[in-house]
Structures are given as C-alpha cells and as structure tokens.
C-alpha cells in the first residue's frame, strides 16, 4: 500500500466498521469521514476513475437504495445488485485510504445487511484485504445464528445490566427424528463454512473483477457433495437412513420451524410438514424447474451442452464437471443461462418461499434464502442430494479407472496406523451476542454470550509407512478418505456403493525420499478444515494492542474461514463405536501439480476452497480416485500406492480432558 497501512491498522478499521453494525458508528474518526468524505471528490483514488462510485452515488441521491433496518437476502435480485455496487466501489480502490473512507461513508447510508455482505466479499477478493481476518459472522449478525429465545434473554440482560451466558438449544423435539442431527446443520462453524464458501466463489463473480475463480463449477459440486456425505455420516451415527432426495412432484415431508427472527423483519417463516410444492410468485413455476432439470439430464445423456451461440461443448472430458457445475448452480460462468436456467439458486428461493408462496402474508425470506441459515433446514440436504445425484449420473458416464490410470510406479504403501484414539465428544462453545442488542445513550454494555454444544474430537496422527522404490526422491500427493462399511441396516456395502458416501479427511503434498519412509501427519493440519475463529473481542484487543504498541499483526492462520471446522473432521459415531474404512491413495505429485507451484505446502483449506486468485493446486478430478464407478474392487486393491485399513471411531458421552 502506498500509504504503508499495516495489517494492524487495517484490522482495527475493519473491526470498527463492523462494531454494532445496526447503529451509527461510535468511533470519532469514522464519524468524521462519514460526515465529510465525498466519494467523488478525487476520482484518481480509483482504478476506474470513479465510475463505480458515481453509479452508487446516483442511486443514493435518487433515494433508490434499500432503507436501513430492513432484512437483506442475496437471493433478492435488487438487494444483491445494491450490495455489488458497493463491492464494485471498494474493489476499485487503489489504496486503503480509499477503501476505509468509502466503507465508513456508505456504512451510515446503506442497508446494514448489504453493507456487511459487500465489506466481507471486498476484503476476501481485494488485494487491499490481504492480512485481514474477518470477524466471525455469528458475532456480527447474531440473529442469523441464534434462536429468538436467547436473543430475548440478551435484551433482558442488557436492560437489567446483568451480564449473562445463555444456552442455545437445537431446534425441534425428540418427537422429530431430524432433531437427532440438528447439531450438524445448526453448527455455527458449519454455517460459516457454507456462507464463506459462497463468498469465496460467488454466483455473481465475473473475471472483470480481477481474476478467474479456478474450477469454481467443480468445487460447487464437491463442497456440497461433501456437506451431504458428511450429513449422511451423522445420520448413520444416529440410527437414521441417508437423506432422501427432493422431488418436485412429491410432498416435502419434513417441515421446519426455525425459531429464529430477523433483527428487522419479524420471524423466519415456518414450513409445515407434508406440503406439495407450489409455484412461487416472482420466483418460478414448479414446471419451469422440471423443464430445467430435464434439459440438464439431456446434456448428460448426450455428453455435451449447448452454449448461448448454439455451439456444442463436450462434457465427457475432465473439464466437463466444471461446465456442468456452472450451469446447475448457475453462476455467471454458465455457458447458457437462458437455456439451462439456474436450478440450484431458484430451488433455494422456491424452498424458502413455500411458507408464503403468493406473498399473501408478506412474510420475509425463509432460511433457505440465506447461506448463513440454509443448512439448518433438513430440506437443504434433500435439495443437495437431488443435485448430487445429477452430478453422479455425469461421473458414472465415465469409464472406470484402470490399473495403469491409478498406479504410481515404484510407490508402495505398506501400512497405515493411527496414533491416538479416534474419539468424538460434545463440548461447549461460547460466542458473544452483544451485537444483537441495541445500545442506549446511558446504558453500558455488559458481557452477553450464547453457549452452544458442538461436536469435537481428540487430535490424532496418521502414520503411513511406505517404500519409494524409485531411484530418487519423488513428490507425492496423499489423499485420505473415510468410507462407510455398512448401511443403517447393517448390510455391508460394496466399494462402488460406499465410494459416493466417502468423506475427504485430508489432501497434502510431500516429498518422499528413496527407500523406506514413515510419513506422519497431524489431524489438525488437514487441508479440509479450519480452526475455530478468534472472537470479535479477541480481534479487537489484538489489533488495538498492535496499533498502540506500534507493531504489526500476523493472523495468517485465521485468514480463511472457508473450510469444515477442525472439530468436525470426524463423524460423531456411536457410544459402542463404529467401524469405517480409511483409504490412503498416494499419487504422482509432479503430475498432480504440473503447471503449479509444485511441492509448495499450500496449508489452509485448499482441498475444498482452493487458493485465492491462483489455480487450484491439484490437477486431478476432485474426489479422485473414488469419484468414478468401481465395478471391480480388485482394480483398486491391485495397485500398491492405494491402501485401506479398518478404523474404529467411538463417541464419548462424557468428556474428560
């Protein structure tokens, strides 16, 4: 940055901008900017000479922007456009001064939800945002993550000036079988992973914003496939069958009562049990979705899609799933949105609106219309099982891998061991809900926290003993998967049946010297997961201390919040223990990373979230080598670089550190 703004100052600015988002800023420097800054005063501060700022200022001056104290949904076209106009302004800033000034100015003038969304995606995608850790959304907009009962208690605590920590219970009762797995869909870390992935890979992204989102369509498939597979693992751990796919012409069996409220806009709508899909005014007719689906099935059966100019594009090739993901979601990368529509996005809005499909009661959007809250609704996983089966039809159209495809010559995996027991348990996690309550002139803030039960596991280490029978050192890619052995009825699954339910535990690159070698890898280093985020309070303290002490701030370990929470790497399992197959596939790292920064430890969460602004670090299809049909298990068993062992995971009801 030309002004030499350090990470500590940037972090402090972002903290201040997001503090008490529903109230005017209390920080004098930001207040001064908000009153006196003119976004069009000096257009040389922007790369586009102020074109984006001019467009947004026109909307503001014409009183066309959504008012404050109103709900915001990304699935609402106009509201999304407004948020993106602010993103465009911030994204065009050359220096931090411009970024900070515009953010402070529009914070006081734009809808709070639009502002938060625009600020988050700008920090994620702009070079100026490097080094900044975005505070956990569950502390910035707690209403989206916390049930109404707890928010009410928070108000009471504030008014009576009594600090408090309040227990959040999962929705539903024991009469509802789905309640057994509510801890998964309602986990605040899982919600953050889902909402952040959609910020990292937004549907609206165009390369003119600065770079290409590599393999976005394929990652859309893989991330949601893994969420669904993980949900099925949790169901298996709770004596439930795998989630059933959604059908447009059948009833939606499971209703959902979210028991959460918007900060402004009333309660999230309830959907009763056993309702038929209805057309939704202003969104779509059910029949439209059936037509869209049949066109996608046609493309898979033909092996090609038709682009908007009428040309055919072959999808029976490695990049095929990428093209398919883009049209199913759909994103701006879709080859032909007019013809293939937007199956996933429209379906989210359709499900969100089933409580009030004709706008008769003027209800706000449902939980499915926010990425923060979508996974709470059991129908989210039914919708994604439906999408997942479309992708499976495509991957099943490829020939199975042969021995030669899978072999990494000279590389032998001799054994796999786990150092440490695979034990899961629930523990308590606290987060602040101070931002949920309003501040009065004379009412001091008191500590108000929500306490939730979250799944966790003991740390463990993989020990992979192997032999590299080649002359020299080789770069290897280690791919680790956990696969079910039996279904919910105790029937043994073939590998071909199990492979689609496997979950990715880790993927890493490592040089293996010639001769025998033992590779050790800690569960906490997984490229699939992220650690718990620092609290907003902790981010504020660290930034303030660094600024006051004149030293810089390095929070790079937390820079990405896209990734499965560390604590949820393993499925819960059962108290008596469950057995699973642990697969380790070692593949040729030079081929896998050809054309990339080979052998470099990408760290972070590249397995499901890629690397910002760079090509995806692995050339193989996501899910390799289990993503294609395996009619004959002997092919997998016959290569020396792939091995599996049976592991046992036990759930402890009482946890003692």
From Swiss-Prot:
First-listed, main subcellular location of the protein, grouped into a coarse class: secreted
InterPro entries, A to Z: Di-copper_centre_dom_sf (IPR008922), Hemocyanin/hexamerin (IPR013788), Hemocyanin/hexamerin_mid_dom (IPR000896), Hemocyanin_C (IPR005203), Hemocyanin_C_sf (IPR037020), Hemocyanin_N (IPR005204), Hemocyanin_N_sf (IPR036697), Ig_E-set (IPR014756)
Tissue expression: Hemolymph.
Residue pairs linked by disulfide bridges in the UniProt entry: 93-98, 483-502, 562-609
Effect of residue 132 to V: In minor component B'
Result, substituting residue 49 to Q: In minor component B'
Domain of life: Eukaryota
Outcome after substituting residue 32 to E: In minor component B'
Assigned keywords, A-Z: Copper, Disulfide bond, Glycoprotein, Metal-binding, Oxygen transport, Secreted, Transport
One Gene Ontology MF term: oxidoreductase activity
Oligomeric and partner information: Hexamer of a number of different chains, of which A, B, and C have been identified.
UniProt xrefs under PANTHER family: FAT-BODY PROTEIN 1-RELATED, LARVAL STORAGE PROTEIN/PHENOLOXIDASE
Additional record remark: The B chain contains two copper-binding sites. Three histidine residues are ligands to each copper ion.
Function: Hemocyanins are copper-containing oxygen carriers occurring freely dissolved in the hemolymph of many mollusks and arthropods.
Name listed for the protein in its UniProt record: Hemocyanin B chain
């Amino acid at each position: 940055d030309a002004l030499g703004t350090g990470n500590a100052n940037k972090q402090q600015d972002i903290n201040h901008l997001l503090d008490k988002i529903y109230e005017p800023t209390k920080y004098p420097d930001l207040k001064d900017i908000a009153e006196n800054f003119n976004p069009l005063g000096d257009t040389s501060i922007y790369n586009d000479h102020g074109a984006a700022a001019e467009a947004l200022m026109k909307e503001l001056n014409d009183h066309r922007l959504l008012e404050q104290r109103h709900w915001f949904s990304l699935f609402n076209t106009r509201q999304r456009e407004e948020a993106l106009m602010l993103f465009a302004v911030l994204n065009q800033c050359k220096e931090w001064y411009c970024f900070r000034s515009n953010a402070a100015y529009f914070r006081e003038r734009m809808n709070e939800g639009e502002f938060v969304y625009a600020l988050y995606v700008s920090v994620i995608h702009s070079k100026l945002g490097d080094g900044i850790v975005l505070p956990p959304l569950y502390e910035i907009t707690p209403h989206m993550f916390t049930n109404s009962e707890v928010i009410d208690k928070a108000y009471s605590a504030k008014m009576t000036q009594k600090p408090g920590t309040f227990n959040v219970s999962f929705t539903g009762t024991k009469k509802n079988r789905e309640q057994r797995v509510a801890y998964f869909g309602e986990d605040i870390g899982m919600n953050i992973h889902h909402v952040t992935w959609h910020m990292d890979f937004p549907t609206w992204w165009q390369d003119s914003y600065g770079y290409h989102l590599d393999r976005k369509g394929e990652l859309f498939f893989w991330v949601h496939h893994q969420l669904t597979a993980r949900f099925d693992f949790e169901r298996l751990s709770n004596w439930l069958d795998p989630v059933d796919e959604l059908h447009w012409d059948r009833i939606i069996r499971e209703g959902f009562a979210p028991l959460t409220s918007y900060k402004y806009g009333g309660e999230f709508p309830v959907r009763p049990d056993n309702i038929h899909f209805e057309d939704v005014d202003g969104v779509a007719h059910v029949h439209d979705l059936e037509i869209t689906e049949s066109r996608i099935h046609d493309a898979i059966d033909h092996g090609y899609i038709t682009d908007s100019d009428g040309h055919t594009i072959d999808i029976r090739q490695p990049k095929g799933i990428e093209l398919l993901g883009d049209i199913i979601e759909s994103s701006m990368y879709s080859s032909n949105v007019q013809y293939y529509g937007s199956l996933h996005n429209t379906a989210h809005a359709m499900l969100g609106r089933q409580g009030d499909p004709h706008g008769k009661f003027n209800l706000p959007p449902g939980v499915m219309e926010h990425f923060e809250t979508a996974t709470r609704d059991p129908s989210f996983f039914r919708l994604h099982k439906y999408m997942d089966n479309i992708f499976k039809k495509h991957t099943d159209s490829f020939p199975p891998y042969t021995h030669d495809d899978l072999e990494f010559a000279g590389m032998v995996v001799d054994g796999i061991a786990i150092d440490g027991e695979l034990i899961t348990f629930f523990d308590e996690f606290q987060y602040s809900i101070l931002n949920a309550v309003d501040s009065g002139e004379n009412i001091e803030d008191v500590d108000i926290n929500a306490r939730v039960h979250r799944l966790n596991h003991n740390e463990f280490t993989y020990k992979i003993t192997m032999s590299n029978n080649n002359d020299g050192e080789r770069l290897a890619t280690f791919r680790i998967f956990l696969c079910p052995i039996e279904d919910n009825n105790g029937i043994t699954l073939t590998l071909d049946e199990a492979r689609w339910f496997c979950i990715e535990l880790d993927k890493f690159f490592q040089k293996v010297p010639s001769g025998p070698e033992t590779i050790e890898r800690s569960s906490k280093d997984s490229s699939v997961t992220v650690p718990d985020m620092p609290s907003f309070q902790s981010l504020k303290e660290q930034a303030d201390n660094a600024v006051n002490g004149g030293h810089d701030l390095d929070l790079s370990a937390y820079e990405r919040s896209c990734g499965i929470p560390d604590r949820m790497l393993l499925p819960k399992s059962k108290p008596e223990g469950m057995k699973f197959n642990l697969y380790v596939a070692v593949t040729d790292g030079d081929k896998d990373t050809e054309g990339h920064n080979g052998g470099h430890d990408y760290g972070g969460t590249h397995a499901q979230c890629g690397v910002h602004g760079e090509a995806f670090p692995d050339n193989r299809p996501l899910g390799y080598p289990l993503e294609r049909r395996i009619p004959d298990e002997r092919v997998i068993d016959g290569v020396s670089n792939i091995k599996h062992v049976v592991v046992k995971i036990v759930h402890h009801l009482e946890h003692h550190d």
